[in-house]
Structure formats: structure tokens, C-alpha cells
Swiss-Prot record:
N6-acetyllysine PTM positions: K78, K91, K165, K185, K215, K239, K296, K301, K307, K314, K324, K328, K329, K335
Pfam families in alphabetical order: Ldh_1_C, Ldh_1_N
CDD domains according to UniProt: MDH_glyoxysomal_mitochondrial (cd01337)
Family per record: Belongs to the LDH/MDH superfamily. MDH type 1 family.
InterPro entries found in the cross-reference section: L-lactate/malate_DH (IPR001557), Lactate/malate_DH_C (IPR022383), Lactate/malate_DH_N (IPR001236), Lactate_DH/Glyco_Ohase_4_C (IPR015955), Malate_DH_AS (IPR001252), Malate_DH_type1 (IPR010097), NAD(P)-bd_dom_sf (IPR036291)
Molecular function as annotated in GO: L-malate dehydrogenase (NAD+) activity; protein homodimerization activity
Modified residues (Phosphoserine): S246, S326
Source organism of this protein record: Felis catus
Protein name per its UniProtKB record: Malate dehydrogenase, mitochondrial
Gene: MDH2
Length: 338
């Protein structure tokens, strides 16, 4: 089962399950008892790249930690429960992954989650700024288009802001794009790579199918349809789960893939590239997802948008107003915090 999980999308994920991989990454998962947090913690526990795994939530973490601790892999697991234990969970961490928050229900957009998740992310990232200011911060909590600006503003307030270490995890958009294009063209999804830029909600998700490797040719009707499916794939899962949650397993997989790529880069591996929603100067939007070359200190180089088609140019132009509004909403939230 786990070998099948390890197979697709991303050499980093495959390597993380190999016994030859050696590392001592200390990783914390905040929101570890939730629908994404539990399978994400399982994937992290299963990787030899991780030597210490600390799990935090406001309920059930001792049980999740006890369960995971019985797995015969090298990562030492410890659970932390409630705000008073959060500092100990974070001390010494190299990477912090935050999937905490409420999931979407049918009829909700990612933006509908803002009121609840904004304060959760602000609280957790404030603790990160205080107790592990040098760690890489990976935000999964939606709406990512707003929670990344929130994280940045919180770190600025604490005087420890480093834009090269704060990542909005958009990897699921890439995973979905790879899968859907592979299905459409009869390809092995493990060998397909579609960069996805922009943001992480609806029309701000911009798959660059013109840059797909291997190169694929699609008629405009298929291109429009598959682009729409990639943009609304999260809603597809929310509807299919019929009120029982949102994408959890695929999101955990994508989150683990991003963390393993980051750890590979921290270890000095060269040529590690992932897309992520970060502080950016690629457009007139202050945050934007593009392919990033990762390194020991986080973002080594923003690889930018590259050559794109007129269809993709149009999508960027249409996405920017919504993206700017979501970013401003996040920034204003922190400014108005007491």
C-alpha cells in the first residue's frame, strides 16, 4: 500500500520512502488530529528523512501520537495538546506544516473559511515566530491566498520575517494537473509535470499546460475543460464527500511531497523545484505562485512564469484582481488584530 503511495508525482516523495535516504529533519504538524493532519503525519512518520515528528492540536493528539509511534520507522513521535504545550512542540523545528482549521462543506468556497481559519493561522504562526523563527513554514490552511499574507504580517510584527521561508502549499494543484493530463493523454502520471501558478482558489489556479513535460497538444475545448476541472477539483471532492469533508488524503500526499522536497533542498540536494504561493515580484501582485528553486535557506531562486500561451496570459489577467483582494483581506486582518 505504502509503496503505491510513494510512486507517483515527485522524485522527492519516492526518495523519502527509500531506506538509503538519511537525514535528521525535525518536523512539526499543527492540526495533526484533523482530516489532513493524520494522513500527513503518517506519511511523514514513514519517511527516513524525518528524525523527529512533533504533533500539535487542541484535541486527540496524544492518541494520534501513540498510534503513529508504534510504526517501525526512525522518526520519534510526540504529541502536544493545547496552547500551553505548543511552545515545546515547536522548539528546534526545521519545518512546520500547518493544516489546522475547518474544512469546506458543500456550497462553501475556500474564502468562506476565512473568518475561522484566519485567527487559527494567526495564533499558530505567532507561536512559530516566537519559538522557531528560523523554521520553514508551510501553510496548508485555506484560504491560502489570504493565510500566507497573514503569516507574513505576523512574522513582520515579531521582527523575524524572512520571505524565503514562508510557503503556501499549492502542490495539490500540480498533483491534480499531472493526474488529469495523464488521464486525458494516456500517460503515466508519475512522468507528467504541469507547473501551476497564481493562487490556490478557483480561477486564481492557473495550470501552464503549454509548459507541460512531456509536451501535450490539446484542442481548445479540451484545454478549457481540463483547466476548469483543475481549478474546481477541490469542489469536486467536497461534493463527492457530500458534507463529510474536503480533500484530505490527496492534500496530505501533496503536503508530504512538498515537505520532502524542502527537506531534500535543506540537505543540499541541487535542482529541487516546486511551485508554491510566496512573496513575489513576478507580477504586480505581492504574492504569487511560480516554480521555485529550493535551497538550504528556503527559496534559492524564483524561476518565474516563463513563456506562456495567450490563453494562459488571459487567465493571469483575470485572476489578479481576485488574488489582490484576497491578499489585502489577509493583510488587513493582521493590522486590525488587537
Amino acid at each position: 500500500m505504502l509503496s503505491a503511495l510513494a510512486r507517483p508525482a515527485g522524485a522527492a516523495l519516492r526518495r523519502s520512502f527509500s531506506t538509503s535516504a538519511q537525514n535528521n529533519a525535525k518536523v512539526a504538524v499543527l492540526g495533526a488530529s484533523g482530516g489532513i493532519g493524520q494522513p500527513l503525519s503518517l506519511l511523514l512518520k514513514n519517511s527516513p528523512l524525518v528524525s523527529r515528528l512533533t504533533l500539535y492540536d487542541i484535541a486527540h493528539t496524544p492518541g494520534v501520537a501513540a498510534d503513529l509511534s508504534h510504526i517501525e520507522t526512525r522518526a520519534a513521535v510526540k504529541g502536544y495538546l493545547g496552547p500551553e504545550q505548543l511552545p515545546d512542540c515547536l522548539k528546534g523545528c526545521d519545518v512546520v506544516v500547518i493544516p489546522a482549521g475547518v474544512p469546506r462543506k458543500p456550497g462553501m468556497t475556500r474564502d468562506d473559511l476565512f473568518n475561522t481559519n484566519a485567527s487559527i493561522v494567526a495564533t499558530l504562526t505567532a507561536a512559530c515566530a516566537q519559538h522557531c523563527p528560523e523554521a520553514m513554514i508551510c501553510i496548508i490552511s485555506n484560504p491560502v491566498n489570504s493565510t500566507i499574507p497573514i503569516t507574513a504580517e505576523v512574522f513582520k510584527k515579531h521582527g523575524v520575517y524572512n520571505p524565503n521561508k514562508i510557503f503556501g502549499v499549492t502542490t495539490l494543484d500540480i498533483v491534480r494537473a499531472n493526474t488529469f493530463i495523464a488521464e486525458l493523454k494516456g500517460l503515466d502520471p508519475a512522468r507528467v509535470n504541469v507547473p501551476v501558478i497564481g493562487g490556490h482558489a478557483g480561477k486564481t489556479i492557473i495550470p501552464l499546460i503549454s509548459q507541460c513535460t512531456p509536451k501535450v497538444d490539446l484542442p481548445q475545448d479540451q484545454l478549457t475543460a481540463v483547466t476548469g476541472r483543475i481549478q474546481e477539483a477541490g469542489t469536486e471532492v467536497v461534493k463527492a464527500k457530500a458534507g463529510a469533508g474536503s480533500a484530505t488524503l490527496s492534500m496530505a500526499y501533496a503536503g508530504a511531497r512538498f515537505v520532502f522536497s524542502l527537506v531534500d533542498a535543506i540537505n543540499g540536494k541541487e535542482g529541487v523545484v516546486e511551485c508554491s504561493f510566496v512573496k513575489s515580484q513576478e507580477t504586480d501582485c505581492p504574492y504569487f505562485s511560480t516554480p521555485l528553486l529550493l535551497g538550504k535557506k528556503g527559496i534559492e531562486k524564483n524561476l518565474g512564469i516563463g513563456k506562456i500561451s495567450p490563453f494562459e496570459e488571459k487567465m493571469i489577467a483575470e485572476a489578479l484582481p481576485e488574488l489582490k483582494a484576497s491578499i489585502k483581506k489577509g493583510e488587513e486582518f493582521v493590522k486590525n488584530m488587537k
